[in-house]
């Protein structure tokens, strides 16, 4: 079952939380969507000036900052593990790199052998900035423990995406 909960907008940011529950009402997927509205000059339109339907807000089910924030800093000694240049095939209708393409890049930071040997137990992705055609993105992977990794994608020195990848155990045959 899929549940959608709206958050109360602050002055500029709109948010929705999504939950997918299995048959035993256990949450198996959680996601949050955050966005703002820009005018034709690229300025943020205050939330109070954006027409929208009245919705039932469910703050008790909404994500907290701790649920979605992932660090953006990677130790200075880390070298890029994967790099790519954004091309037209990564674009979406909004004329920037499609969000799901970032997930592909994060998993390109692991070898097939590494992924085959483990079971994925958690994946969090935080989009920080848009990427456009011609941008060179460098992805850095840092082990936080034996089973938890942080991946940060940067355009130059600017982080554009941050991810947390968690494994629960070794894959059994």
Label each PLM-derived region with a short phrase:
Residues 2-5, 95:
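Short secondary-structure boundary segments
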Residues 6-76, 127, 131-133, 142-173:
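HotDog/MaoC-like acyl-thioester-processing domains
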Residues 78-166, 172:
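Acidic/His-leaning functional-site neighborhoods
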């Amino acid at each position: 079952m899929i549940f959608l909960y709206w958050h109360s907008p602050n002055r500029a940011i709109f948010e929705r939380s999504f939950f997918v529950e299995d048959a035993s009402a256990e949450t198996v997927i959680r996601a949050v969507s955050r966005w703002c509205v820009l005018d034709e000059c690229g300025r943020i339109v205050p939330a109070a000036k954006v027409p929208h339907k009245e919705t039932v807000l469910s703050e008790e089910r909404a994500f907290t900052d701790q649920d979605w924030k992932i660090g953006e800093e990677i130790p200075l000694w880390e070298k890029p593990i994967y790099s790519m240049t954004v091309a037209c095939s990564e674009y979406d209708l909004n004329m920037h790199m499609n969000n799901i393409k970032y997930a592909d890049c994060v998993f390109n930071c692991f070898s097939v052998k590494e992924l085959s040997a483990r079971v994925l137990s958690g994946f969090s992705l935080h989009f920080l900035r848009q990427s456009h055609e011609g941008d060179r993105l460098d992805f850095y992977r840092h082990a936080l423990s034996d089973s938890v990794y942080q991946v940060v994608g940067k355009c130059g020195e600017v982080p554009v995406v941050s991810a947390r990848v968690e494994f629960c155990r070794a894959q059994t045959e």
